[in-house]
Amino acid sequence: MPARTPRRTTRTAVTCALLVAATTGLTACGGLTPGGSSKSAPSAGPVSTALPTGSATLTVVSSENAGTTKALAEAFHAKHPNITVDFQYTGPDDYDKSLNLKLSSDQAPDLALLNKLGTTVKGNLVRSLDDYARAYGWDAKYPSTELDQWRAPDDGKQLGAGHLWAAPAGFSVVGVYYNKDIAAKLGIQPPTTPAEFEAALAKAKAAGELPVQLGNLQGHSSFIVQSIIDAADGAAKTGDWVNGKSGATLKSPGGTAAANTLADWAKKGYLPDGANGTDLPGSVADFTKGKGLFLFNGSWDAQKIDRAMPGRTGFLTFPSESGKATGIGTSVAYAIPAKAKNPDLAAAFLDFMNTSEAARIQFDTGFLPVAHADTVKGADGSVMNEVAKGWAAVNKDNGLVNFFANTDATMNDTLTSQGQQLIGGKTGPEQYLDALQNDWTKGHQ
């Protein structure tokens, strides 16, 4: 992600092309305007992978300002000189307020960035990409967890299954940064099991080092909790919970372990004093000053950390007993409006986004590649190389899980308040899990 600090890793920021960089301008994703929905989408008709031979213009609307989509558009034009990509940027607040009206207009764009599904799907404002996915073989090109985040039935409610409505243009992932200087001084190797991770924390504490840097003012202890749950229970099970699948629960072995672990780390002094009053940018700043062996955070801050600690930071996915890699993350994604004039051309541009050429562009502009993650490389010693390696492992093991905060409209607030209370000793692990599960139940009734 671009080296910018997320304004807020909340449900809105995350849903907005994640936090993909929060200042990529994708942080104000509140509910899209309900107006402008059409009663039924026009017939999709047959699809084609053939590109036009004459001059053509592809119109793309977006609130992504990291430069990724624009650079992809320029590369696509260079490859197909007869095709002009008209990239139209709108600031996030105005974009979200006006998107549904744009989609329902007779002058609808050919591609539109989606921050979330829901009213766009239920209102028949975007077309299913199922036929294009079959035509281009996307199911074989993408790990299923990448595409499943943009699948939903016609009512747009439960995610993870049903029709495909958008295709990704770049990802971000949460993992664990570590200070190589502190690790080397203490003789700590990158942990490969949960037990080794715990041992590293104990060793750091005994040596007078802060084991885990954390800013929890905005609820980022959820990164710790979800990382542990994802690794323990597996991506499929936790993905069901995020997607609202009936019967899913965090009252699981992984959930119990995660809640107990966060409470235990707080009691043992593994977390900084005042964590509940520090925001994410503050914790990143403290980490780059040498305060903390580990930091749970996303790829969007990798370049910032790199600049402050060149060659002195590592990155890993939270270790699991199974050896399978999991990671929290989501993507910037684009949909084809139901009223698009050039849907076949739009789909061709979406397919271009999973090429090796696109991977280089995505990586260079701060995103993790949609595909071909093993082909990208940053400067020697850059932590982005370790982030890319972790991302490739997550893809290989089909281990991507959307942010817990994205499961319903109020979960971010619950994660924030309950995480602060658990760290502050004002609630217990069981009560913490009960609160999260009760919120989930209300949100998915």
Identify the function of each model-found stretch.
Residues 2-123, 299, 322, 361, ...:
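Conserved N-terminal structural module of periplasmic/extracytoplasmic solute-binding proteins
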Residues 77, 224, 260-345:
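Extracytoplasmic/periplasmic substrate-binding proteins
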Residues 117-173, 314:
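Hinge/lid segment of periplasmic solute-binding proteins
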Residues 130-146, 216, 234-257, 307-308, ...:
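Short, solvent-exposed loop/beta-turn-alpha elements that line the ligand-binding surface or hinge
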Residues 160-169, 174, 198-248, 292:
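Extracytoplasmic/periplasmic solute-binding protein
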